[in-house]
Amino acid sequence: MKNNVRNIREIKRKEFETVCRHKGLAMTIQRRTILDALAARNDHPTVDQVYEDIKESLKGVSRTTVYRVLETFVSIGIARKISNPESKARFDADTKRHHHLTCISCGKVIDLHDPTLDNLVPDADTLTEFDILDYSITFNGLCSCCRQASAQSAEKDRSCSES
C-alpha cells in the first residue's frame, strides 16, 4: 500500500509540475504539500481533512489557503471537486472518469469504476444547444457501516416494541 501511495504521489507531482509549467503557475511548497496530502488519500477528503493532514508540516497555513489551492488544482485539471448540496465539498486526486457512491448518513464517498456507466452520453441530436464536456454519476445510499448500524437500530426498535 505504501508503494502504491508513493507511486500515486510521484505521478501526481509530475503531472502537477508539467501543468504548472504550461499554465505559468509557481510550484510552491504549499501546493506541493497539499497535492501530496490529497494524493495520499483515497477517501475524497474535505478541505478540513486536508488542512488537518498538513497543518504540522506547513506551520501558519490557513484553511482558506488549503481551499484556494484545492480550487486551483480543480481549475487546472489535476483534481476533481465532488460537490454535494447536503455536505461539504470533497476533493479527489483521481481525475480519470469514474463515478461515486455517497453515503447519505456519514458522507463517505466511494469510487465506483463501472465501464457500463461511461457511455451514457445522450444522443447528439437531442443536444442541439448544449455540448457535454464531461460528466460523473453519483449514487446516494448507505455505506455498509451505516447500513449495518441502521439494521441493528431497527432490530433494537422492533425488539423493544415487541416486549
Predicted feature locations:
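N-terminal leader segment of winged-helix/HTH proteins
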Residues: 1-26
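Short capping segments at the starts of secondary-structure elements
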Residues: 41-46
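A short acidic, leucine-rich amphipathic alpha-helix
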Residues: 49-55, 66
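Non-DNA-binding regulatory cores of transcription-related proteins
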Residues: 76-163
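Basic amphipathic alpha-helical segments that dock to polyanions
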Residues: 66-76
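Pre-recognition alpha-helix immediately N-terminal to the DNA-recognition helix
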Residues: 32-37
